[in-house]
Amino acid sequence: YTTDDTAKFKADVERFAAALLGREPFASLKDRFSVRGVMKPSQERGCDEPTRGVHRNTALGCTFNSLGSERYLLTEDNRAIREAARAVPYDVLSIMVNHTRYGGGGIYNLFNTFTSDNQWSGYVFVHEFGHGFAGLADEYYSSSTAYTDFYPAGVEPVERNITRMLDGKPKWAALTSAGVPVPTPWAKAEH
């Protein structure tokens, strides 16, 4: 966001706060969350897109193609992040990038990133927030690589939302209502 984008930045903060706090479990707990935006103007809007030859002069140095993934959006400029973030107390740090391209990233207890202006931005924000806030794993149903490929046979994943059900039930079985099938069907077509 540039200085000229300040009004848009404020509106986007409100929009994404509503996207997060309008979904469970956050909707039921919204009195426990405080969302604040810190405007750190960039010289140019957007972010780097190295494989497309695009390099922007931005305050936080966000870039697509992180770790070799086209849509993975991260920054390595920890100093710039912490300088901007010190303006307010925080438990979770989300970096909103003024861009139309689909993408984001999330690293547990560090930060999460997302772009502001594509049809999936709200969904991506909540998804990446799950990584940064709760250390949740990806559950890409369309991926050719299953999360079970990342763990040796017989090893239960550390992430709270995935399981190999080594003892015949998911690790969250105590939180599941009676009669809920495992695996639980979901609204896959919406996503």
Language model: regions and residue ranges:
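Propeptide-to-catalytic entry region of secreted or membrane-anchored zinc metalloproteases
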Residues: Y1-E83, S116
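Solvent-exposed loop/turn segments at secondary-structure junctions
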Residues: Y1-T3, P41-R45, H99-G103, Q119-S121, ...
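Short pre-active-site segment immediately N-terminal to the catalytic Zn-binding motif
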Residues: T6-F9, G104-E128
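Extracellular/periplasmic catalytic domains that process cell-envelope and extracellular macromolecules
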Residues: A27-D31, A85-Y90, I107, W186, ...
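Structural recognition of the beta-strand scaffold that forms the well-ordered cores
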Residues: S34-G37, V92-M96, V124-F125, H131-G135
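Catalytic zinc-binding patch centered on the HExxH motif and its immediate surroundings
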Residues: G46-E49, E76-T115
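Catalytic Zn2+-binding segment of zinc metalloproteases
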Residues: F129-T145
